From Swiss-Prot:
It is found in: Membrane. Keywords: Membrane, Metal-binding, Sodium, Transmembrane, Transmembrane helix, Transport. Inhibited by dinitrophenol, 5-(2-naphthylmethyl)-D-hydantoin (D-NMH), 5-(2-naphthylmethyl)-L-hydantoin (L-NMH), 5-bromovinylhydantoin (BVH) and 5-indolylmethyl-L-hydantoin (L-IMH). The affinity of benzyl-hydantoin is increased over 10-fold in the presence of 15 mM of sodium. Residues 479-489 have a biased composition (Polar residues). The keyword NAD does not apply. This is Hydantoin permease. Changing W117F: Reduces moderately the uptake efficiency. GO terms for cellular component: plasma membrane. The gene is hyuP. It comes from Microbacterium maritypicum.
Length: 489
């Protein structure tokens, strides 16, 4: 039996991947800044900064952190624009350049990298839990705490970005106060000044400073690429002009910078200072070394700090997106909650903590893998389509994003070429790959446009998906006829 227009239009639409309607959005600039502040206080920055002190002095590490985070925010301005305006998640947005089925390749890569981080951060939180129980009772069982902490984060993610937002609003000031106090304890315990610590480190120079910056960009690139899953909840003016939309994008990017950079600098400094003063990059061990001599209760309190920092980061940054990917890609198999559970299990089975000792090398490779993906998505939305999309076609198996049986092989080829080109500049792999993909995608899509149109008359129906006016109506005759003609080409 042939499907009706409304059934066909909704064949890829389900409650988990539908655009977030204007009236349902609850995140403003302040809330987004709080989310990013809490996400930025993550143990991975602690470790990366600590491992970097062999090549750079502490002040240089701080500059690299600030520069890397600023670059990440600049990219966020572009990658999140479509999600803020149209309320779509990353899996749906990837259909525009890569096709309805072709998007499976980049989103699977992105999901696996996010799950790597989920497992890694869960291990760090479990280490803190294990240390707390060891200090209190002498009991230690790291595998048990990995499972328990993973389950806690699964339940947290069930409640979505709204719950995570409120948790981060609470956690942010607590984490800030504890971080500042830990800095004081380290300096006081070592009897050194802030200026003296800033000049420590750098005994074995060799790493280019540009690589240091790219490492901190790499720490955020997985979130930068899939930021849609967070900012699709951001409030916007439905009637804003193109200029008004740009101002909204800038306002949210500014909020992200204010949340990300100060927190990253504080926690990065703690990691770098711990390494030069204690000689330990593992935050759980470093805290016991620094604070344990002062007070066991204080050491426990700061292990709670590590636990809270990880808990406030991991669900939003690393578990939300893979869950959306599963339920958007296989809507008949996974609900959002089952997607969260499966994603968490896969992340833990990857056992990413085995790579803790070479984290900076991994971050650089991560940036190189996702740089071309970010370049293609920015180029496609801003330069190729000029911020025009068809929500109706994003949820159809037979629309303008179908390309060759659902796959845009040209965009995938651009990704492969840009990735290969990035290896020509080992110290700037991320930048080279991003720029190469951004530039190559433009002529590539002009060639694609000779066969498949880039725009659809169904764009006029975008607001039907965003305003509370009831079910989406069938496409009008002209749009349907136009789409059929496109698919026959």
């Amino acid at each position: 039996m042939n499907s009706t227009p409304i059934e066909e239009a909704r064949s890829l639409l389900n409650p988990s991947n539908a655009p977030t309607r204007y009236a349902e959005r609850s995140v403003g600039p302040f809330s987004l800044a709080a989310i990013w502040f809490a996400m930025a206080i993550q143990v991975a920055i602690f470790i990366a900064a600590g491992q970097m002190t062999s090549s750079f002095q502490v002040w240089q590490v701080i500059v690299a952190i600030a520069a890397g985070c600023t670059i990440a925010v600049i990219l966020l301005f572009f990658t999140q624009s479509a999600a803020i305006r149209w309320g779509i998640n990353f899996t749906v947005a990837a259909r525009m350049p890569f096709g309805i089925r072709g998007s499976l390749i980049p989103i699977t890569l992105k999901a696996l990298l996010s799950l790597f981080w989920f497992g890694f951060q869960t291990w760090l939180g479990a280490l803190a839990l294990d240390e707390i129980t060891r200090l209190l009772t002498g009991f230690t069982n790291l595998p048990l705490w990995i499972v328990i902490f993973g389950a806690i984060q699964v339940v947290t993610t069930f409640y979505g970005i709204t719950f995570i937002r409120w948790m981060n609003v609470f956690a942010s000031p607590v984490l800030l106060a504890m971080g500042v106090y830990m800095v004081y304890l380290m300096l006081d315990g070592a009897d050194v000044s802030l200026g003296e610590v800033m000049s420590m480190g750098g005994e074995n120079p060799g790493m280019p400073f540009s690589t240091a910056i790219m490492i901190f960009v790499g720490g955020w690139i997985a979130v930068v690429v899939s930021i849609h899953d967070i900012v699709k909840e951001c409030k916007v003016d439905p009637n804003a002009s193109r200029e008004g939309q740009t101002k909204a994008d800038a306002r949210y990017a500014t909020a992200q910078w204010l949340g990300m950079v100060p927190a990253s600098i504080i926690f990065g400094f703690i990691g770098a200072a711990s390494m030069v003063l204690v000689g330990e990059w593992n935050p759980v061990i470093a805290i016991t070394e620094v604070v344990g001599g002062v007070s066991i209760p204080m050491a426990i309190l700061f292990q709670v700090f590590v636990l809270l920092a990880t808990w406030s980061t991991n669900p939003a940054a690393n578990l939300l997106s893979p869950a959306y990917t599963l339920c958007s890609t296989f809507p008949r198999v996974f609900t959002f909650k089952t997607g969260v559970i499966v994603s968490a299990v896969v992340g833990l089975l990857m056992m990413p903590w085995q790579f803790a000792g070479v984290l900076n090398t991994f971050l650089n490779l991560l940036a190189s893998a996702l740089g071309p993906l970010a370049g293609i998505m920015i180029s496609d939305y801003f330069l190729v389509r000029r911020r025009r999309i068809s929500l109706h076609d994003l949820y159809r198996t037979k629309g303008i994003y179908t390309y060759w049986r659902g796959v845009n092989w040209v965009a995938l080829a651009v990704y492969a070429v840009a990735l290969a080109v990035s290896f020509l500049t080992p110290d700037l792999m991320f930048v080279t790959g991003l720029i190469a993909a951004l530039l190559l995608h433009i002529p590539a899509m002009r060639w694609v446009a000779k066969t498949f149109p880039l725009f659809s008359e169904a764009e006029s129906r975008n607001e039907d998906y965003l305003r509370p006016i009831g079910p989406v109506a069938p496409a009008d005759e002209s749009a349907t006829a136009n789409t059929k003609e496109q698919n026959q080409r």
